[in-house]
Amino acid sequence: MKRRSKHVYFIAFILMVLGVLIQGLLLSGHIPLVHLSQFRSHATPLPFQQYQTVVASRDQNTTPVLRMQRPNFQTGMIFPQWGTNAYDSTDKNWQVGLNDIENQTSAQWIELPINLYQSSVTSTQVTVSDMTPTPNAVATGIRTAQARYYHVFIVPLLSVGGTLTWSGSIQFSTTQHMQLWFDSYWQALQPYVVAAAQAGAEELAIGTELEKLQLAPAPLWNQLIERVHQIFPGKLTYDLNWSSLYYQIPPWMHNPLLTAVGVSVYIPLTDRPQRLDPAILPGLWQEKIGKLLDSFSIQLTKQVFISEIGYRDSAFALYRPWERDAQAQAEPADPEEQAAAYDAALMNVIVDPHIIGVYFWAWSVPLFEPNWKPAAKILYKWYTSPQA
């Protein structure tokens, strides 16, 4: 009897210890899911049944959380600032705008443009101007955005001659002049590459819409890519204009150091100023734009993303969507058409496996801004969708 009593007490002690351990695991939330799986319900799944749910076991009032199908998809907004102090701690527009973008759109990525300058399309000298933020200001802006849990994408833009001359028109007749330009461009860009690296930006474009220069000898581009890569540890991209989609892909775009290629997508869906029926926009967008981007991605053998897309608050939003001149400013406002254009783009992009992100032009930019408009609600709908 005494021996049996000892066994009973020993077994009781073991059971008590095991009970304490199991209780601790349950309270800590660290019980292996492989063991929990055998207790999962086999009830009818929630809508979007391809998505799993996770249980917050630390709280007794647990709420299923829907996992995003594409958690690395870049749900972006472009938020440009101009001036030497742009993006720094004194830039209140930057501070307020970051909060508004989060609340109104739920964007996870911020595209931060840096405006460089050259005097003409044949100048070999690239410089900063009084519209260019300092490297320190850019670093501060990156940290401010990241403190609000944004990912940051740094994009250099190039203004030519202080006018609306497009950077894609820059060209040279000799390789020597091209080399001079690339060296000067690197000297202007380098301090911002350093700032982006030190502040921890996640992604950086080596250039934007330099359409005619894209035909420069591949060694010049590969040298630029290597120079940036030696400093910046994050993802590298190049952003081309949509008109380049109709040309042969330059060999340097296959450089493995470029993780993806961005496209500025201002492709019109109509050839005359008219309001389009929102019901036809998703199919029209896929036919005229989606197929073109998919074909480019397949030929490139890399995923692509929309580094810039925008639609005016206008009844003619789908006609020459890049325009911002006096005629565009005189168009009748139509926030519903703008929102329908956003919706058509996102309906196609979010589910396209060839496309890994999208950035809209632009927060607080007149004509294009979605701030406090139906377009912002469309962004929020898609950026918080389980399909994103």
Can you describe what each PLM-predicted range is?
Residues 72-73, 105-125, 136-214, 314-319, ...:
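Substrate-binding cleft and catalytic face of glycoside hydrolase catalytic domains
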Residues 122-126, 172-177, 273-280, 317-339:
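A solvent-exposed, charged loop/short amphipathic helix patch at secondary-structure junctions
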Residues 86-103, 181-195, 243-254, 339-348:
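Short, acidic/polar
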Residues 19, 23-24, 28-36, 40, ...:
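Aromatic-rich peripheral "rim/lid" segments of glycoside hydrolase catalytic domains that contact
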Residues 1-17:
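N-terminal Sec-pathway targeting helices
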Residues 133-141, 147-150, 155, 223, ...:
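Glycoside hydrolase catalytic-domain groove-lining segments
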Residues 30-109, 143-147, 151:
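N-terminal carbohydrate-binding accessory modules
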Residues 216-239:
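Active-site neighborhood of glycoside hydrolase catalytic domains
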